[in-house]
Amino acid sequence: MRGPIRMTATQDFGRTEVAPLIDRFLDLHPAVQIALHLSDGVVDLVEQDIDLALRNGPLADSALKARLMLRGRRVVCAAPSYWANHAAPNHPDDLAAHNCLVHPRPGSTFSSWSFTVEGRPVTVRVAGNRVANDGGVLRQWALDGHGVIMRNALDIRKELASGALVTALDTFVTSNANLYAVTAGSVSSQRVRTFIDFLAKNLVAD
């Protein structure tokens, strides 16, 4: 098996989870070349000639084919040092009193976090003194005790398991953050199918 695979993943998850698996896959298949494009935005698979995307959440484009890789959810969390100095929120509205570490919309310095409250969807506007378009930067700021983040639990599962980050608002449902392997239509390349199978086997939820 030989040839290229062009793929995309979110920046933080791509660095911490996907890149090491690429190393393992290429040890098994040294004639394959993998190009990994990291972006927290949505990449057009057809326009950018991408074979495979790892994406979170439900898919809006029905023309894309998706395979569920991991079930995930978004969580609100902060370091124990932050919670020691700031009362943990009991309701999403309480986030207005917290320094929220924001992954902004283009041209904005705030973000909107979504919850389900008493069966109704609720969107809460949050803001803080640190803004970044890189999930890894936001994660590190949270670990350093600078504020509260909302992240896919899959991206920070090691930090949650170790207690380096502690969740809040767990009784409020957040949006779907399942991880999917997405392709533009049917996958014709054997190497892409083999790589997706490899990821499905090795991206194991803790």
What is each PLM-predicted segment?
Residues 2-65:
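Central regulatory/effector-binding core of bacterial HTH transcription factors
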Residues 7, 25, 111-125, 157:
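Ligand-binding cleft/hinge of the Venus flytrap
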Residues 31, 153-164, 172-206:
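C-terminal effector-binding regulatory domain of bacterial HTH transcription factors
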Residues 34-38, 123-134, 172:
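Short beta-strand-to-loop elements that line the ligand-binding cleft
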Residues 52-55, 147-151:
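Paired acidic/hydrophobic, glycine-rich loop segments that form the ligand-binding mouth/hinge
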Residues 61-66, 159-169:
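Ligand-binding "clamshell"
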Residues 63-74, 78-103, 118:
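Flexible hinge/capping segments at coil-to-helix
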Residues 95, 141-145, 160:
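Hydrophobic residues within well-ordered alpha-helices
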